[in-house]
Amino acid sequence: METVNTTARLTTLRSLMKENGVDIYGIIVPSEDSHASEYIAPCDGRRAFISGFTGSAGTAVVTQDKAALATDGRYFNQAGKQLDGNWHLLKTGLQDVPTWQDWTAEASAGGKTVGVDPSLISSPIAEKLDESIKKSGGAGLKAVSENLVDPVWGSDRPARSSNPVKLLIGKYSGKDTAAKLTELRKELEKKKAAAFVLSMLDEVAWLFNLRGSDITYNPVFYSYAIVTQDSATLYVDVSKLDDESRSYLDQNKVTIKPYDTLFEDAKALASAAEAKGTSEAPRKYFVSNKGSWALKLALGGDKFVEEVRSPVGDAKAVKNDTELEGMRQCHIRDGVALIQFFAWLEDQLVNKKAVLDEVAAADQLEALRSKQTDFVGLSFDTISSTGPNAAVIHYKPEPGACSIIDPEAIYLCDSGAQFLDGTTDVTRTLHFGTPTAEQKKAYTLVLKGNIALDTAIFPKGTTGYAIDCLARQFLWASSPFSTKQGLDYRHGTGHGVGSYLNVHEGPIGIGTRKQYAEVALAAGNVLSIEPGFYEDGSYGIRIENLAMVREVKTEHSFGDKPFLGFEHVTMVPYCRKLIDEALLTAEEREWLNQSNKEIREKMAGRFDGDQLTQAWLERETQPF
């Protein structure tokens, strides 16, 4: 991981901050684009450019004399290596470490003004930060419409994609746009909303059954939409749409307008509402609570705007039967590629004594995946990590700067793919030599947590926040009556996953984030289950499956509530030599045996003639 000298960049940025018309003491540089995307296109990587830190999550704050970068536990190690001496690392979530918001407010004391590009920050965060700055003695938060990082970046800034947008046919989507619009309009009428303005790219893609490739690994395209009771307007670069997409949108009564006209139309909506001047409380324009501050300002602010959890996001998170079956099928094909890969990798390292680096291994896995039916591409950068690199939770191997895979060390592979019928995300941790007793114990405690959550049964209305501890319990203590381990991991246990959409999908998830306590899990949700353990500088372990939430039959029905459970769809065995059978209960061994039996059955006939892979699969799935 390379450290970038940011001195010249910061000097230029600070100069721009002092210019007439701007005149700010500090500036916030978020990770997101104008659509609050977690993963962004290269042209939107402003925070990475100005700080040198390339992780996917983080916020930079630059003042005239200081600079800070805040990120979460997944990236502490990486940020520590990439940030140069100009930067102070704020380790989010650690005791006595201020949030970036508190750090900014404190730095603004004495009547100072802090600026931000309003299109890159959500209005709830912006408004709360403005209050905090003023309470700390600062002048407040200023919307700076011209992004100040862009001129620092200059001609080196990548151009925005002009990739085509394609229709996702009903065979894969399971529901047409007209039906989705009808359901959305019912929700809007129920809540007396005048319109819903969509700004999240995956929500627009899902609603209109379109897919693009403007952001690497995410099949989305730059777009907005406005839906009222009588109209639906898609704002997109019209030249990207082919005849099939245009015809489909026309059939579903969708108007197409240029992407850049959204804010003009938003201001027109605000003007129309102002002119209406009714004595009754006006129906408001609904926007996502992740929507940008710029969008809210354009729509007239609090007078005409209500920020809500997106009804489109909620609907998208509950997959229909076609999407669920697609998830099952694409995970079988994905499992074929992964099993072939692990068998190949072991043969190369152990039998052929080959020298392979982490990138070469990741490239081989991608090549195997690409042979599977309906493969589109990867769903994120493959984390191919050996030894101490596996302790870096979101490690990214770089060509020419990565490690040689050590067969006597832990190897962690977190990878996923986009298929026309679904999205995959799976992590397996392996050892090709002789693991230590400590490594086997850690792996088995993580596995026990994975099994505990996979087999959990819970009443409808339960949140991911409430069941997070099931996956961590064995790291905390092996059992209630034995050794208190005192171990844990610094990431969520699970995230929602899209259907041929973003690999990280809200609003549901499993973990300690506040949002996971606000949204109940529902039948049709698809989530990851991925507990882990990381020994910095030594090794890392993570075991990740994707699972669907489904109704389960129970002997009783307390309070007439249905009960829910999980159906895992990942079809890849666990690393047998890392499992300490002495730590497993009889029930856990039986669960493993049933899981291995299912994998063998679903892989039957898929490796004909490939004796190496078949032998590896049979060995790894032998009964305990």
Swiss-Prot record:
GO terms for biological process: proteolysis. This is Probable Xaa-Pro aminopeptidase P. It catalyses: Release of any N-terminal amino acid, including proline, that is linked to proline, even from a dipeptide or tripeptide. GO terms for molecular function: metal ion binding; metalloaminopeptidase activity. Its EC number is 3.4.11.9. Mn(2+) 1 binds at D425, E530, E544. It comes from the Eukaryota. GO terms for cellular component: cytoplasm. Its cofactor is Mn(2+). SUPFAM superfamilies: Creatinase/aminopeptidase, Creatinase/prolidase N-terminal domain. It comes from Chaetomium globosum (strain ATCC 6205 / CBS 148.51 / DSM 1962 / NBRC 6347 / NRRL 1970) (Soil fungus). Catalyzes the removal of a penultimate prolyl residue from the N-termini of peptides. Binds 2 manganese ions per subunit.
